[in-house]
Every structure is written in structure tokens, then in C-alpha cells.
Amino acid sequence: MKTWKLIVLVAALLVIVILGAVGGRWYAGNRKPNFTGKADLYVRPQMTVDEVLAQIPDSIVVNRHNLSRVVRKELADSDLKPGHYVVEKNKPSVYVVRMLKNGWQSPVNLVLSGTMRQKGRIARKIANQMMLDSAEVADALNDSLLLVGYGFTPSDVFSLIIPDTYQVYWTASMKDILDKQKAAYDAFWTDENLAKAEAQGLTPKQVSIVASIVKSESNYAPEYSSIAGVYLNRLHQGMRLQADPTVAFCYGYTLNRILLKHLEYDSPYNTYLYEGLPPGPICVPDKPSLEAVLNPDRHGYLYFCANAAMDGTHKFAATYSEHLRNAREFQRALDARRASGR
């Protein structure tokens, strides 16, 4: 009888030990925190589980063996859903499985900023931050049928883009991104801003065209309103804008220096040859340049040229003779700088 009781006791202890081991293993995979930091995972189509796991650095993993065992047991390559995922601090290994299997994506910041004046470069800027291919982005920016749904054309699509930081899913389509841009565009064009544009005799798209020239003329934002005032004065007086950046646009921004011969390039974008505004923006205008056109300085200036101080500012003039003096002053300063080898 005692022997039988001993056997039962030993068997019970073995069951407890086994259950404890199984329970401990379950706890390690399903409840015990296994990450000491965050990691970004980017899952592309056709990726394998091993390729995804390789994106999690050892430095934030408490138990790599546990992570590999749990994920490989519960997740097949075919279960992976493309997207951007974030491994959070203090999460258990099984969280990675659930996140990837259920497609619990985390949005990314799509940053549209800096100089954006060529569709190819804009396409690369977007593609570098998204799962999209740059050719797919470029095609969308030239797709008349797609853009007409937003009220734009390939010629004026730069007007639609409002530089900012946008939260989007990494797997977003170009239509998703354009939807975001249209929402931002509509948000910018409040009743107040529409009234300001109308007061200047401009449509919103025309404001973008002038703003693109203003932005292309200077990197010094405090001068934007003064430069905008010059171009609006010329426009209202029926003068040709004679904006050098429009010539640079005609040559695909390949010129190091604009010469007199370049001013003869026959294009509706060449404001030396054609009166009024070009057909579309010559770059993506930012909010400061748009606001400068809506709130221009009130002055009588019709000309401006680079300041002889070479500090990125400009000198403004109301008459052509005054402008020529400023231009000669700048040329002398430029010649002196070249002579000194600076």
C-alpha cells in the first residue's frame, strides 16, 4: 500500500514539474517582457520570417532563443503582411507574432520639405520614405486621369503639394498620399485665404505659381513678402515678370549661371518672353512663400537684385536706373570676390 502511495506521489510530482515547465515556457513566450527597447520592422512582399527577425537588434532582446522559437512556431512566411511595425519595449515575444499576423501597422512620418522642383526628385523623396517605387510615384504625378479627380493637371500638380509632415501607413498608395495632400490643400485654403487671393486678383493656383517664383528667388524667408510685392506690382502693371528662376525651370535646372542667350528660350514658362504667369508652378511652394503672396509688402518696387554684401539678401529698386546701380554694385563685389579666390 505504501509503495502504491509513493508511486502516486512521484507521478503527481512529475506532473507538477512538467506542468510547471510548460507553464514557464508559455509565460516566457506569452507574458514575460522580452524587449528592452523599440525596433522598427519593415515587411516587404515576399519577405521571410527570418528576414523580419533579423531587423530586431540583439541589443534590445532579452532572450533571442525565446523570440526565435515563439515566432517560428507561430508564424509562417505566408502569414506576414507588408507594412511598418514597431516592436515596443516590455512586450513579450508572442506580441511580435500577433502584430505581424494581424497587420497591426504603425504609421510613419512622410516628410515633404526642402527644395522640390522636379517630379523625379519628388518621386524619389517620397519613395525613399514609403514602400512605393519612385517610378510609380512619378507616374501618378503625370497621370492626367488621376489628377483631374483632385482638380489638378500634371502642369499644376505642384500646387496640390503642401510641404509638411504627414502620418501615413508605409504601405499607402499614391492615391492615399494624394488624398492627404488634397485635405491639406483644402485646409490651407480657408475662406480668409481665399479672400486674400481674390483681393490680389489671383486664384489659389495662381497664388501657388507666384509663390513658387518667390521661393525660387531666395532662401531668406523674411524677404519673401518684399519679393512677392515686386512680382505682384509688375503683374498688376502689365510688365513681364522677367524672373530668372523661370528660365532655370525651362532648362530643367541644369544651368549654373543664366546668360543673355538663355533668356531667348521659347517656352510659356519663360517670363522674359511671355507676359503674365507661367502655366504652372516652377517648384513646390512652401507655406511661408504662399503666405507672402497672400500678405505682400506694400511698396513701389519693381526690381531687385542680390545684395553686394553677399549675405543672401537683396536690394530693391523702384526704377530701372536704380536697379542698374544696384546690379553694378553687386557685380563689382562679385568680381572682387573672384579675384581674391574666395
Write out the residue ranges for each language-model feature.
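N-terminal start-of-chain detector that recognizes signal peptides
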Residues: 11-16, 58-59, 82-84, 136-141, ...
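Generic detector of short, locally flexible boundary/turn motifs and exposed helical patches
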Residues: 4-9, 16-18, 50-53, 74-77, ...
